[in-house]
Design a protein with these regions (language model features):
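Membrane-embedded alpha-helical bundles of multi-pass transporters/translocases
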Residues: 1-258
Length: 258
């Protein structure tokens, strides 16, 4: 719900920003910093605190994190599409972006092994607090890289942009609502939305039960060791090195629609 409100607002702000830095870079930079800081703070939890306190703490920092994600993510995606006017080159840009992003799914499952290894950390609680800081620092640096290295044209003197005020933001939301109703009246668009909904929700639902399926059905409830980690990591490696290049190639040769 928070994203559904903030994303179109952030899109309007980014699209109509007048700046010597362009429309995207500054938001990618500051959004990455906010997101990284909030991620590190989000996991600084202690068992001795009350359930109500920890719940409130996580909820507040989650909102801050997703605010940073919105500030970063909306301009970042737009920046990727604006890097080229060529139809197929944009496909290559998005494929490379997805390829790099998949490495998070290759690496992240191994955190479970590190967290519960006493040679690394005395407890999983301490591991969570420490790892969150390291992850935040490393990936914040990665996230600000597009803002530093991808150059954008100055929009300081653009006169065709709408003013960044409350009336302009409210008007953009009304336009988005009208465009959504118009787009959703198209049968192909509805099919695409339904397919996307089923695919993403199906994937996330099944993925959340993976550990329990492996432990219950393969190990009869015993500790599964590194097998859940291998399942997630190997699956991500297959996607990274096989699926993404093949799909990108098919999109160029057969067309995205087919």
């Amino acid at each position: 719900a928070f994203d559904s409100i903030m994303d179109p607002i952030m899109g309007f702000i980014s699209d109509n920003t007048r700046s010597t830095w362009g429309r995207r870079r500054q938001y990618v930079f500051w959004g990455a910093l906010l997101m990284g800081f909030a991620f590190a703070m989000l996991w600084q939890l202690y068992r001795e605190n009350s359930v109500a306190y920890n719940f409130t703490y996580v909820m507040v920092w989650s909102f801050v994190f997703y605010l940073g994600l919105t500030i970063f993510g909306v301009p970042y995606v737009s920046m990727g599409y604006e890097m080229s006017d060529d139809y197929h080159e944009r496909t290559s840009v998005m494929a490379i972006s997805q390829w790099i992003g998949q490495w998070a799914w290759v690496i992240a499952p191994w955190f479970w092994v590190i967290m519960y290894d006493p040679a690394w950390f005395p407890s999983a609680d301490e591991a969570t607090r420490s790892l969150s800081i390291w992850v935040a620092v490393v990936f914040t640096l990665c996230a600000i890289a597009p803002a530093v290295f991808i150059k954008g044209e100055s929009t300081k003197d653009r006169s065709d942009y709408e003013p960044l005020d409350f009336r302009g933001i409210l008007g953009s939301i009304n336009k988005i609502a009208k465009n959504f109703v118009e787009a959703f009246s198209s049968p192909p668009f509805r099919k695409l939305c339904i397919a996307t909904f089923l695919i993403f929700n199906g994937f996330n639902t099944v993925a959340s039960f993976t550990y329990f399926v492996i432990r219950s059905h393969l190990f009869n409830g015993a500790a599964p060791g590194v097998w859940p980690t291998l399942f997630g990591s190997v699956g991500a490696i297959v996607t990274t090195f096989i699926v993404i290049p093949i799909v990108a190639r098919m999109a160029k040769t057969m067309g995205k629609k087919r």
